[in-house]
Amino acid sequence: MLLDLNVESPERSGTSSSSVLNSGDAGGGGGGGGGGGLFRFDLLASSPDDDECSGEQHQLPAASGIVTRQLLPPPPPAAPSPAPAWQPPRRAAEDAALAQRPVVAKKTRRGPRSRSSQYRGVTFYRRTGRWESHIWDCGKQVYLGGFDTAHAAARAYDRAAIKFRGLEADINFNLSDYEDDLKQMRNWTKEEFVHILRRQSTGFARGSSKFRGVTLHKCGRWEARMGQLLGKKYIYLGLFDTEVEAARAYDRAAIRFNGREAVTNFEPASYNVDALPDAGNEAIVDGDLDLDLRISQPNARDSKSDVATTGLQLTCDSPESSNITVHQPMGSSPQWTVHHQSTPLPPQHQRLYPSHCLGFLPNLQERPMDRRPELGPMPFPTQAWQMQAPSHLPLLHAAASSGFSAGAGAGVAAATRRQPPFPADHPFYFPPTA
């Protein structure tokens, strides 16, 4: 007999406790039925109907095939392998955006784009809140002006690029937008065209004026000055209430020093060039002007001053002493009385000048007249007369730019007059005047 657990009875398909006994002997068993006899033993689920016909013989069809049942649950689906740690995860939306992004053809440029503007040659300055336009020419950056909008600054750059580099220049807009400018810029030089662009701007972003040579001073007024002229860093022209006045002052100075070809803020024809003074004469006058804070000494070689030279020869204790010449103006009162016979006379009002002769040190100390010994003529001054002089002498000449008033000089002169004159016994030699 063969016991097959994979085949279940058609009547008890839902019961799992049925057993099928298959007899391999075709002629064995009771009942006299032909074919294979099948005996079913239902031990767990029994009913009265089943008990009555428990001895009945049933005929079951032969199994046509083997059925395999899954006893264990199926395994879960395998998870996708994680991305490596060095590769960041990419989203599907980003991949789709990259795939749909159109490829823009880049225009050939000579330099990088501006970091703060989409236009070439335009830069935004946060400190001033203005848009500045620049262009490179011969390795130098040329300033074109400050503007309120980036569009205006870009147009200024385009005009300068066409002027500097021709029709093949890289510009921000179409070349057809500048047809009118092409006709006008042919008659101008590069420097003149740059100044025209600056005048059309809304003001200098780094300075405070759109005019050349004009800046806003700290005091609130407009300062005009010229730079790099006559070897100086700049020349100060003055302060003005309005920037137009300062610009016109700069124009007049530029025409005065550079001629009719000077670059000005306004048209040179609006100025009377013939009435302007010559720059060469002013340069000479400025060169002779001495504003140093020092004591002025009389100049014997000055042909402009009307002075008379009076010779005063003093005998000093040094054998190498030289003659001393004192200059006396013609208009002032004579301080040394000189006769035609050249006789020595005591001075009435002394006026001292610094001298290189060490022996010319007068004794200004008061002495009683009765105690002074009677001395004859001495060829050389005594040692006491040399050493008893004060270390500093009052000087009546002051510098023109020192700022001292005339009253102070008069006080010093009065104090000098109260001092006694030179000793009468000191010999003076007055050479005859021509």
Curated annotation (Swiss-Prot):
Q: Where is this motif: Nuclear localization signal?
A: 106-115
Q: Mind telling me which InterPro entries this protein's record contains?
A: AP2/ERF_dom, AP2/ERF_dom_sf, DNA-bd_dom_sf
Kindly list the places in or outside the cell where this protein is found, as annotated in its UniProt entry.
Nucleus
What segment(s) does the record annotate as region Disordered? 1-116
Q: Where is this motif: EAR?
A: 291-295
Q: Which GO terms describe its molecular function?
A: DNA binding; DNA-binding transcription factor activity
Q: Which residues cross the membrane?
A: none
Pro residues bias: start-end ranges: 72-87
Q: Does the keyword DNA-binding apply?
A: yes
Protein name as catalogued: APETALA2-like protein 2
Q: What organism is recorded for this protein?
A: Oryza sativa subsp. japonica
The encoding gene is: AP2-2
